[in-house]
Amino acid sequence: MTRHEPPGLPVRPAYPAGRPPGPGGRSLRLFVACELPGEATEALAAVQRLLQERDAEGARWVRPEGIHLTLKFLGEVPARRLEAIERALARAVREPFRLSVRLGRLGSFGGSTGLRVVWVGLEGEVEALAHLAARVERALEPMGFPRERRPFAAHLTLARVKEGASPQDRRRLFDLVRSLELPPLPGATLEAVSLMQSTLEAGGARYQCLARFPKSSPAGA
């Protein structure tokens, strides 16, 4: 879960006991994202409940507080590289910004028999979001993080399909996603880029914000 930090960013995490930052063999699972305001998170949780109530078998649900807009996935990174990554992001996202988006349609990746992900799309200033993602890509590419081959798609992941899900479960969930009519969903204002850490646990991944950019970003943006 993202912590709410006072101004004066980038923020530093409270690392789990026995896992302090520093050089050595320890690695962090990192990604770059835009976090969502509370109203959007609550609306997405309601969409998850609508799907769950309709017998969406085979899905592994993202914790509502962990739903975010991914700009760049970095993977397992040595902890000693953390400060260099923060400096690169600080250069890429220097100026304050405000992007207005709306929660849009329900969709999926993978087709009816290979369904992998269920998501809600974003509408509004998505072209500006794509430019923001491209700035992040350019900043991190010289550090050995290759650019994404696929074009940027502004979406918020609600669920991932379990590896052992049957073709029937995938088809049922695919049909549900196609047929479900969503109620009107709220908009959101995005004002910060966050460097996030993902920790895999038995109940699913937990996310923690390590730093936000630009440095003047409000906490929890």
Residue positions per predicted region:
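Histidine-dependent nucleotide/RNA phosphoesterase domain, centered on the 2H-phosphoesterase fold
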Residues: 2-221
